[in-house]
A protein has these predicted regions:
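Canonical leucine-rich repeat
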Residues: 67-70, 89-95, 111-117, 133-139, ...
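Extracellular beta-strand solenoid repeats
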Residues: 58, 82, 93, 104, ...
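Leucine-rich solenoid repeat scaffolds
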Residues: 201-239
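Extracellular beta-strand solenoids
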Residues: 51-53, 59, 76-77, 83, ...
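Charge-dense, intrinsically disordered terminal/linker segments
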Residues: 1-48, 53-56, 226
Length: 239
């Protein structure tokens, strides 16, 4: 099984010149990005070249187990970063530290942790349908417009989620959730925890929701009054 950048490596990498390694990086990157890419002049203290992009980066739909190798790491991506539908991916280590728009790691069925995810995402973060994910630990501390962890059937807790979302937050169809402990404290848009078949408590729900609040079709037969006890919701409440 191949790692993401295996095509850049050989058994005698240490003997290659900086120019040779950079040329191989550039050749590979032609298929993954748009916009302007910058490669550091020299490797960092860990021996890796630092690569940034002003545009989008996509490694989706690939048979990869890791986003890292001994050649280079992403630092900042100005657009979107896609690593969704990589069913063998087990870690987000090596992902950019910052992403200007959206970060997608949806439907990565072997992903068990969000450790290594960007610290800051300007647009939004989506890990929809990651069936082996049990925790949100390692999720971005800032996810500007939205955060989606819906369809993560093994997710047992929302601990690790950003505590403030300007837009929407969705954890619907997370079949192992029993409470909302760890959810953001403030959601500017819509909050969805509907169709969570094990959810029996609204404890931990956001204190403020600027849009709608959905908690229908859960194990607990919640009422509008139940929601109002735990959250100040400006929009429609659907139980």
């Amino acid at each position: 099984m191949k790692t993401l950048y295996e095509s850049l490596l050989d058994d005698d990498l240490i003997t290659k010149t900086d120019k040779m390694i950079k040329d191989e990086i550039k050749l590979f990157l032609k298929e993954t990005y748009n916009g302007v890419v910058k490669i550091s002049k020299k490797p960092n203290a860990d021996g890796k070249y630092e690569v940034s992009s002003t545009g989008n980066v996509s490694v989706k739909n690939r048979d990869i187990i890791s986003l890292t190798n001994g050649t280079f790491i992403w630092t900042v991506v100005g657009g979107d970063f896609y690593c969704n539908n990589c069913n063998s991916l087990t870690s987000l280590e090596g992902a950019p530290e910052k992403v200007g728009k959206y970060f997608y790691c949806d439907n990565c069925n072997s992903l068990t942790s969000l450790e290594g995810a960007p610290e800051k995402v300007g647009g939004g973060f989506s890990c929809y349908g990651c069936g082996s994910l049990e925790s949100l630990k390692g999720a971005p501390k800032e996810a500007g417009e939205a955060f989606y962890c819906s369809g993560c059937k093994s997710l047992k807790t929302l601990k690790g989620a950003p505590q403030m979302i300007n837009g929407g937050f969705s954890c619907h169809t997370c079949n192992s959730l029993t409470s909302l402990e760890g959810a953001p404290k403030k959601v500017g848009g819509t909050f969805c925890c509907d169709m969570c078949i094990s959810l029996i408590s609204l404890e931990g729900a956001p204190k403020e929701v600027g849009g709608r609040f959905y908690c229908n079709n859960c194990a607990g037969k919640f009422t509008i009054e139940d929601v109002k006890k735990v959250s100040n919701v400006k929009g429609e409440i659907k139980c």
